[in-house]
């Protein structure tokens, strides 16, 4: 007679085994109608799952994050059902959930077009409206193999052969005549899957291996209700307008070429943003007492073997050979910084030693994963490594946290999600060291009044870490900053210091990045500001325009004075109507537009407009310089 304990502490007793849905029905028909799945003793299960003994139970609905995930996964199966009806010869591969949606990889001789997506979505809608029940059947490995052999599903057979033990009992989900294999859980019926949209088609290699066949990947999104779906579509449209690749092209900031995949060609205005950002971070490095260094971009294989990168990260490194020696272009800066620390005897009095570098790194990212500035092969990290004693770790971490928030606040990022990743199963070091390290990071966050959540088991094998994720104006998450403890690398590379007792000790190494990579952070800024950078960061801060040729000499004097005062100023003396020139430079996102006509020239003034269209009226050139100077210095 199972006794079911609900989240509010109430209990319900039953005379015999009951399913999750039975419990929901016992509570009320409204809840049963909303129930998608359940969590029995912490384990997520289907609504049809039987409870045979006393257990705790949480009923999952579309209001729960798990419920939405299940809806999305079931929509992937619904897509599979629709594809099979419209294209009977299609071979189904995998159909997982992703952020905000799902996809399904298919093997089909003909290409899926935009028109085909419309037809598929229509068929999905027709199927969902029937509200058919999703039936879960668990059987032997052979039962599943026979079912997919009969249907000619070669990819499902490969999954069975390569990923599922023959002693396992895989679950098959029956969507009328369509069958799919999955761990689940899934919705009990298609009544829960009505708010979806197919988004696009892309190519994807089977198993992510370029040696395998290229499949077609159909992406979709799914939500709990119509309002959420509509809001997401609106956000997507806004994100499209903010796409840094499009804005970068419009503003002539950078470009890419097939001859250098994942490498950025910076143009003058884009490089201006880059160097201003670097200058800003360099000022912060001086403020927070860092030494700036520059380590080689390429080092001998032997060093990467000692550091462990050759064993753990060889596929991600670009290598070359010269004079029978093998070299790797650095994918990260830490080994080079340890070499700098190792030059000369270090005493406890030298610690903490903070070493920073704008390190140019290269990683052999798969070509299919490259995405504008957000995912590149060549990038610059605002990287730093702090060598310190164990007793200094907590104080140093607090300084890192302070610097992170100082920098993010300068760009208006106030919504920062913080996570603390703790020890993984595969790790080095004693539990005592890990206890100290995790407690130290947690205490540093607490002392800094930073709310955070734990990510159990997500730390690196050599130490725990803090991750800082920026939430942008569209609610998108961008993981940028990290503060990570490392007990392994200093020891592997022979880093030591002499303690107060004249004994040698291995320092603790703190890896610290704030922007993550300059390229990616610039991409984030472009999308956050839609190219309307703060004045201090804008590649062109002001443009002066004449109304007739008569004012040209005066305009040239003004632009010369602006440049002499250190501003990035341009002049537009073209024989065009002033309205046309104003519109053009507004589209270029220039913060201040200066207009000169006869009246301004006679009074020695300028008319000032902002890119938002605000008319600031006439002012003297000196007053404008003072205004601009204050704005740039305060980094508004």
UniProtKB/Swiss-Prot annotation:
GO cellular component: cytosol
GO molecular function terms noted in the UniProt entry: ATP binding; metal ion binding; threonine-tRNA ligase activity; tRNA binding
EC number(s) from the headed UniProt entry: 6.1.1.3
GO biological process, one term: threonyl-tRNA aminoacylation
Compartment(s) of residence: Cytoplasm
Major location category of this protein: cytoplasm
Claim: Ribonucleoprotein is one of the keywords in the record: no
Cofactor: Zn(2+)
Family of the protein in this entry: Belongs to the class-II aminoacyl-tRNA synthetase family.
NCBIfam families: thrS
PANTHER family: THREONINE--TRNA LIGASE, CHLOROPLASTIC_MITOCHONDRIAL 2 (PTHR11451:SF44), THREONINE-TRNA LIGASE (PTHR11451)
Function: Catalyzes the attachment of threonine to tRNA(Thr) in a two-step reaction: L-threonine is first activated by ATP to form Thr-AMP and then transferred to the acceptor end of tRNA(Thr). Also edits incorrectly charged L-seryl-tRNA(Thr).
Protein name: Threonine--tRNA ligase
């Amino acid at each position: 007679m199972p006794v079911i304990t609900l989240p509010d502490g109430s209990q319900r007793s039953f005379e015999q085994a009951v399913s999750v849905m039975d419990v929901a029905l016992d509570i009320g028909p409204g809840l049963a109608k909303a129930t998608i799945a359940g969590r029995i003793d912490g384990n997520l299960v289907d609504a049809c799952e039987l409870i045979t003994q006393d257990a705790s139970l949480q009923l999952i609905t579309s209001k729960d994050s798990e419920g939405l995930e299940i809806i999305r996964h079931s929509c992937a199966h619904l897509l599979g059902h629709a594809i099979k009806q419209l294209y009977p010869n299609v071979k189904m591969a995998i159909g997982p959930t992703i952020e905000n949606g799902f996809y399904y990889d298919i093997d089909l001789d003909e290409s899926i077009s935009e028109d085909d997506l419309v037809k598929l979505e229509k068929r999905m809608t027709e199927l969902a409206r029937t509200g058919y029940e999703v039936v879960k059947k668990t059987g032997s490995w052979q039962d599943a193999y026979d079912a997919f052999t009969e249907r000619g599903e070669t990819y499902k057979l490969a999954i069975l052969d390569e990923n599922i033990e023959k002693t396992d009992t895989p679950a098959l989900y029956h969507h009328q005549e369509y069958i799919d294999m999955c761990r689940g859980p899934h919705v009990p019926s298609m009544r829960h899957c009505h708010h979806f949209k197919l988004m696009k088609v892309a190519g994807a290699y089977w198993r992510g291996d370029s040696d395998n066949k290229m499949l077609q990947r159909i992406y979709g999104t799914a939500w709990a209700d119509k309002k959420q779906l509509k809001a997401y579509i609106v956000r997507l449209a806004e994100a499209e307008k903010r796409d840094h690749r499009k804005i970068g092209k419009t503003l002539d900031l950078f470009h890419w070429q097939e001859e250098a995949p994942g490498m950025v060609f910076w143009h003058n205005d884009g490089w201006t943003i880059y160097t201003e950002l670097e200058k800003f971070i360099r000022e912060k490095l001086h403020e927070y007492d860092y030494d700036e260094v520059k380590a080689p971009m390429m080092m001998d294989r032997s060093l990467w073997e000692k550091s462990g990168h050759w064993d753990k990260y060889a596929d991600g490194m670009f290598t070359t050979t010269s004079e029978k020696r093998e070299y790797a272009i650095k994918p990260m800066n830490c080994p080079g910084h340890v070499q700098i620390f190792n030059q000369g005897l270090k005493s406890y009095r030298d610690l903490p030693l903070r070493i920073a570098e704008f390190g140019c790194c290269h990683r052999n990212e798969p070509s299919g994963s490259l995405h504008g500035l957000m995912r590149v092969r060549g990038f610059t990290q605002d990287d730093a490594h702090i060598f310190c004693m164990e007793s200094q770790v907590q104080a140093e971490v607090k300084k890192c946290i302070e610097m992170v928030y100082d920098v993010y606040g300068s760009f208006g990022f106030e919504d920062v999600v913080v996570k603390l990743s703790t020890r993984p199963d595969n790790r080095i070091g004693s539990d005592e060291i890990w206890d100290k390290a995790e407690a130290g990071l947690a205490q540093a966050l607490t002392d800094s009044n930073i709310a955070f959540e734990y990510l159990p088991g997500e730390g690196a094998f050599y130490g725990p870490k803090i991750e800082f994720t920026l939430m942008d104006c569209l609610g998108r998450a961008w993981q940028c900053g990290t503060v990570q403890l490392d007990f392994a690398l200093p020891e592997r590379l022979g880093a030591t210091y002499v303690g107060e007792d004249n004994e040698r000790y291995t320092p603790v190494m703190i890896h610290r990045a704030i922007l993550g990579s300059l390229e990616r952070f610039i991409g984030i800024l472009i999308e956050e500001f839609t190219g309307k950078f703060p004045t201090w960061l804008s590649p062109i801060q002001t443009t002066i325009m004449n109304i007739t040729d008569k004012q040209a000499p005066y305009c040239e004097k003004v632009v010369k004075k602006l440049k002499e005062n250190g501003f990035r100023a341009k002049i537009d003396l073209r024989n065009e109507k002033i309205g046309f020139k104003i519109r053009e430079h507004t589209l270029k996102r220039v913060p201040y537009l200066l207009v000169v006509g006869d009246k301004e020239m006679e009074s020695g003034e300028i008319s000032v407009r902002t890119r938002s269209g605000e008319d600031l009226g006439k002012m003297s050139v000196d007053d404008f310089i003072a205004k601009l100077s204050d704005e740039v210095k305060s980094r508004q």
